[in-house]
Swiss-Prot record:
Name of protein: Mitogen-activated protein kinase 13
Gene giving rise to this polypeptide: MAPK13
Gene3D superfamilies: Phosphorylase Kinase, domain 1, Transferase(Phosphotransferase) domain 1
Reported cofactor(s): Mg(2+)
Regulation of its activity: Activated by phosphorylation on threonine and tyrosine by dual specificity kinases, MAP2K3/MKK3, MAP2K6/MKK6, MAP2K4/MKK4 and MAP2K7/MKK7. Activation by ultraviolet radiation, hyperosmotic shock, anisomycin or by TNF-alpha is mediated by MAP2K3/MKK3. Inhibited by dual specificity phosphatase DUSP1.
Post-translational modification: Dually phosphorylated on Thr-180 and Tyr-182 by MAP2K3/MKK3, MAP2K4/MKK4, MAP2K6/MKK6 and MAP2K7/MKK7, which activates the enzyme. Dephosphorylated by dual specificity phosphatase DUSP1.
Organism of provenance: Pan troglodytes (Chimpanzee)
InterPro entries assigned: Kinase-like_dom_sf, MAP_kinase, MAP_kinase_CS, MAPK13, MAPK_p38-like, Prot_kinase_dom, Protein_kinase_ATP_BS
Record: residues binding ATP: 31-39, 54
Subunit structure, as described in the record: Interacts with MAPK8IP2.
SUPFAM superfamilies membership: Protein kinase-like (PK-like)
Modified residue annotations for Phosphotyrosine: 182
Length: 365
């Protein structure tokens, strides 16, 4: 089969992996690679801006890989908020569907992520600003009907101006059981996700924000469980062992009898648990690290907490204009059918001017 290539592309090895990039993007430099693909940075000749280019590894290897690739493309395309990573461009060197095997996602380049800088000592002002941005991003994602489910420091990208963007949202639902080589980080996960003990809603992500904020305050992972049971034990040491009202909501009979077998204990005093935290920070943490999903704050409610008063701008707390369309989510399609859908999206893609914050916080990492 002859591989006819489009004009305007060039081949280059980036960290021993062959990349075929549009000529608009120059000076590719390897950034990292993982189970799902590799990322390089490059300069967009048109704007002079640095971008991140992600090449998915073997997107059409199986139905699961192809479906995940389609979902990632659509999610990135849908999200248009300054605190959520979105799609600047998408391209393929293939000139037709027949020779379409790879595609590249272009996003804003961010210097680092929270995991890499967790050892820093964060001032309360920095914590306010970073957590405020996490919640703004989550309010937007949730308003589109998407739940992150796997929020952790490693998928919160930040730059030197303390601007934050949420990565890898909405992909976790496929990742756990189906993708090999994927390790679930349970430390930041809400107990109802780890244990499937009760219905869950969008506040699973708020629990994760609570864990991340606590770690920024103390420099230590809050709940570092060795396994699922140890994770639950560590959580209950902080939240207290809940009473009958909570236990009645549990769907899982084993979880129910386990909780009932434990002596009831009160919640720890958060001002003592987090001596560095201001009373408002401790109060917010207490409301985010709430075992009962019906009582836990939503992102929109958390944004109104007095802790964020110095940075709050309700005009920036926007919602998605329409819900994310996952109508193909439940379809059983072949690899070739997913491929057609993806190719069509790439061919029809037109970049949207992405707005960034109207103001600068003045905070530096």
């Amino acid at each position: 089969m002859s591989l006819i290539r489009k004009k305007g592309f060039y081949k280059q090895d980036v960290n021993k992996x062959x990349x075929e990039l549009x000529k608009t993007y120059v000076s590719p430099t390897h950034v990292g690679s993982g189970a799902y693909g590799s990322v390089c940075s490059a300069i967009d000749k048109r704007s002079g801006e640095k971008v991140a280019i992600k090449k998915l590894s073997r997107p059409f290897q199986s139905e699961i890989f192809a479906k995940r690739a389609y979902r990632e493309l659509l999610l990135l395309k849908h999200m248009q908020h300054e605190n959520v990573i979105g799609l600047l461009d998408v391209f393929t060197p293939a000139s037709s569907l027949r020779n379409f095997h790879d595609f590249y996602l272009v996003m804003x380049f961010m210097q680092t992520d929270l995991q890499k800088i967790m050892x820093m000592e964060f001032s309360e002002e920095k914590i306010q600003y970073l957590v405020y941005q996490m919640l703004k991003g989550l309010k937007y994602i949730h308003s589109a009907g998407v739940v992150h489910r796997d929020l952790k420091p490693g998928n919160l990208a930040v730059n030197e101006d303390c601007e934050l963007k949420i990565l890898d949202f909405g992909l976790a639902r496929h990742a756990d059981a189906e993708m090999t080589g994927y390790v679930v980080t349970r430390w930041y996960r809400a107990p109802e996700v780890i244990l499937s003990w009760m219905h869950y809603n969008q506040t699973v992500d708020i629990w994760s924000v609570g864990c991340i904020m606590a770690e920024m305050l103390t420099g230590k992972t809050l709940f570092k469980g060795k396994d699922y049971l140890d994770q639950l034990t560590q959580i209950l040491k902080v939240t207290g062992v809940p009473g009958t009202e909570f236990v009645q909501k549990l769907n899982d009979x084993a979880a129910k009898s386990y909780i009932q077998s434990l002596p009831q204990t009160p919640r720890k005093d958060f001002t003592q648990l987090f001596p560095r935290a201001s009373p408002q920070a401790a109060d917010l943490l207490e409301k985010m690290l709430e075992l009962d999903v019906d009582k836990r704050l939503t992102a929109a409610q958390a944004l109104t907490h007095p802790f964020f008063e110095p940075f709050r701008d309700p005009e920036e707390e926007t919602e998605a204009q329409q819900p994310f369309d996952d109508s193909l989510e439940h379809e059983k399609l072949t690899v070739d059918e997913w491929k057609q859908h993806i190719y069509k999206e790439i061919v029809n893609f037109s970049p949207i001017a992405r707005k960034d914050s109207r103001r600068r916080x003045g905070x530096k990492l």
